[in-house]
Amino acid sequence: MKILFLCNVFPHANVVSGAINVYHRIRLLAQRGHTVGLAAFKTGADDPHIPAVRAILHEMELLPRPVQQNPFRRFPGNLFPILPHDFSVGYDPAMHRLVGSMVDRTRYDVVVAEFSVMGQYLHHNPYLSAVRRVISCHSCLTTSALKAIRLRPYAPKCWRRRLTVQRLRAVEFAMYRSADLILTLTGEERLDLLKYDPDLSIEIVPYGVDTEYFKPAPARDPEDSLIYTGFFAQEPNSDAFIWFARTVWPWLKARHPGLKLYVVGAGVTRGMREAAGNDQRIVITGPVDDVACYLARGRIFICPIRMGTGFRGKILQAMAA
């Protein structure tokens, strides 16, 4: 079978995000003899990993990750957008054309949009020929928005969410209805989508972990440290760190003078750096080539959760390590 994957984050073996699950789907399908292609967004930090991924693919086309404008420059468009914010952050008209040209060139049997934001390139894409369309929903955008509104009802972002959440729901579920199949990672996520539209065709493809890569390190005395991993451009991850740094960390470091906190992953936000301040015991690494070595170093892995939906694959990685 010929399968084209779409991803908003470049998937490779060392990526610290849910895109690592996408990488292993691609790798295992290619090993089984399928013809697999990839269209994805990337940043400069992904460049060292491109050759290894290209080697397992039939073809690969990459575009720079869309750059977000200052929200004040987009006012009032940020209140009344054509596309809801959750989709506009991953929108590039060039990706519409790219997906269409790749499908025509290679005659793919199916296109899999990983993460709901990439489903927009299968829905109302004027360049896309007839092809089976699958959307892999890692988390429901509408449920995530409603949860954020309940958690921080008076935050500036939530005023925008209140104004646009019904529009988000309409766009998200029109997109799902246009697909031939929806994939979720858990049964709970499947039921959540069916709550909005019981007629959706949904299958569950569970999350996995590479136990050859994430495995217990040789016996040694770990450093007195906490480890938190994630792709911090995603608000649930950055919000969780900011909450932990302001609420829990002061209490912990006062009782454990030698304790360190390692924050491992790309997409670190200004709000995260402000929350860390000048604390020398908080180490924000940014992108790393080997997250497993940090998991082996730490005494405790933490995964605070306040927002978002979906499955946290990093918990499986920490358990395996």
Residue ranges of model-derived segments:
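N-terminal subdomain of nucleotide-sugar transferases
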Residues: 1-61, 106
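Acceptor-binding helix/loop patch of EC 2.4 sugar-transfer enzymes
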Residues: 8, 67, 71-88, 133-173, ...
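A conserved catalytic-core segment of Leloir-type glycosyltransferases
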Residues: 39-101, 105
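Short N-terminal targeting/anchoring amphipathic segment
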Residues: 99-119, 132-134
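Donor nucleotide-sugar binding/catalytic pocket of nucleotide-sugar-dependent glycosyltransferases
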Residues: 132-135, 142, 161-216
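Conserved catalytic-core segment of nucleotide-activated headgroup transferases in glycan assembly
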Residues: 177, 183, 203-297
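Short Ser/Thr-rich beta->loop micro-motif in glycosyltransferases that lines
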Residues: 286, 303-310
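Short alpha-helical segment that forms part of, or immediately flanks, the ligand-binding pocket
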Residues: 292, 313-320
